[in-house]
Amino acid sequence: MESLLLARLPEAYVVFSPLVDVFPVIPVFFLLLAFVWQAAVGFR
């Protein structure tokens, strides 16, 4: 389905395809950020 969606995108959006590849990593990044923040405040 994802390849079908990317195939339908206009030529202008081809530039953003590397950005779309990064999107699934963002929730993991926020989870790590929350963990680091809790470690910084001492797990209150």
From Swiss-Prot:
Residue positions assigned to the propeptide: 1-7
Membrane topology (UniProt): Single-pass membrane protein
InterPro entries: PSII_PsbK (IPR003687), PSII_PsbK_sf (IPR037270)
A Pfam family: PsbK
Any one Gene Ontology BP term: photosynthesis
Subcellular location: Plastid, Chloroplast thylakoid membrane
CC terms in the record's Gene Ontology section: chloroplast thylakoid membrane; photosystem II reaction center
Ranges that cross the membrane: 23-43
Subunit structure comment from the entry: PSII is composed of 1 copy each of membrane proteins PsbA, PsbB, PsbC, PsbD, PsbE, PsbF, PsbH, PsbI, PsbJ, PsbK, PsbL, PsbM, PsbT, PsbX, PsbY, PsbZ, Psb30/Ycf12, at least 3 peripheral proteins of the oxygen-evolving complex and a large number of cofactors. It forms dimeric complexes.
Family annotation (PANTHER family): PHOTOSYSTEM II REACTION CENTER PROTEIN K, PTHR35325
Family assignment from sequence similarity: Belongs to the PsbK family.
Name of this protein: Photosystem II reaction center protein K
Source organism (scientific name): Thalassiosira pseudonana
